[in-house]
């Protein structure tokens, strides 16, 4: 799996164009719970704006056809694109399973941090911060050795000791 940098907001267009050329492309997205006008709304948000993940073996045709797509800025590690490591590939595939956005995760914070559902179950070690009031968690993601921060929506579960 390789990474293409594209213009922010053009991720879906770039993904569709890469699909139309016969290659697999992934854009991690999530349903984010946001407050707007006093109401909580579900909105679709790209998790890593400006990046499209190309899930195909690298060869000259792929390199040149993707580079020519409108909205593509460059391959990461230009000249000789570098593949993601296996852990990074697994994580991106979990985020983009069935080309569906990541739903809000069910999470319990006491006595220990625990993700109960969704593609992120078992990845508690990547959570950096949780914000109950905003219904959000912040996760650490590594892509080609660089750390990125991703925000996901969360439904916080109460434990029996928290109820009064």
Language-model segments: residues:
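Short, charged beta-turn/beta-strand-edge "cap" motif at the junction between a beta-strand
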Residues: 117-121
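Acidic-enriched and Gly/Ser
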Residues: 1-114, 126-127, 131-134, 138-164
